[in-house]
């Protein structure tokens, strides 16, 4: 396998067709890296040391790769596989929101939908565990969606630090976002950040706590959210 320095040098001499082939190769190398290496603390396979990618290159990689990656100001990070408790909580929240918003122009997405936005001039692309968007798709592929209103991240051991710090700060830069919620699958812990309250965290830890999602007019009990979680 060629070094990344060699690949980057060669890219300057390539035609459009050759560049597309190169992006395929980059995608394959990203996939190989994320399969072989253990996820570092905070992210499932940080690839920042390789090189900086344009947003267009990243999107092309995502279209070709069976693995998902997040994009932060030119850096690409492979995403790890969620654990059972994480998946159960995310599915429960998404199902409740989808049922509640039936017939409403806002849409609920769970895990597989990219959320792209600008943060202090940089492009960011995340895959929130659950989010509600109330705008229109930006392109034919549907990668982007305008006006996210609610974002929910379910914490995992490998992503908790990133979710609490980096993402909590970056999501605030989305003008349409009204609420950002962090959910710890074990033990019961819900943290709500609302724009209307200057993003000050509200922490709920009681087993009978009620999560009030004001941005979409839905209230869920902790019992509902954590149902079936071992």
Where are these regions (language model features)?
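Gly/Pro/Ser/Thr-rich low-complexity, intrinsically disordered segments predominantly at protein N-termini
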Residues: 2-10, 17-230
């Amino acid at each position: 396998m060629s070094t990344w320095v060699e690949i980057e040098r060669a890219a300057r001499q390539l035609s459009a067709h050759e560049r597309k082939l190169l992006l395929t190769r980059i995608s394959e190398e990203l996939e190989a890296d994320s399969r072989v290496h253990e996820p570092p603390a905070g992210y499932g396979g940080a690839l920042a040391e390789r090189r900086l990618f344009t947003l267009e290159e990243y999107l092309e990689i995502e279209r070709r790769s069976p693995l998902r990656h997040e994009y932060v100001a030119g850096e690409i990070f492979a995403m790890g596989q969620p654990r059972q408790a994480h998946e159960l909580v995310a599915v429960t929240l998404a199902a409740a929101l989808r049922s509640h918003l039936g017939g409403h122009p806002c849409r609920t997405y769970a895990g597989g939908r990219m959320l792209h936005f600008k943060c202090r001039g940089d492009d960011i692309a995340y895959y929130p565990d659950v989010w509600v968007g109330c705008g229109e798709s930006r392109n034919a592929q549907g990668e982007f969606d305008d006006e996210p209103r609610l974002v929910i991240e379910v914490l995992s051991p490998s992503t908790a630090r990133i979710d609490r710090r980096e993402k909590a700060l970056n999501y605030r830069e989305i003008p349409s976002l009204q609420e950002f919620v962090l959910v710890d699958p074990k033990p019961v812990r819900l943290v709500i950040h609302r724009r209307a309250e200057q993003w000050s965290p509200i922490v709920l830890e009681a087993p009978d706590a009620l999560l009030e999602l004001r941005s979409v007019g839905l209230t869920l009990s902790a019992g509902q959210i954590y149902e079936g979680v071992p």
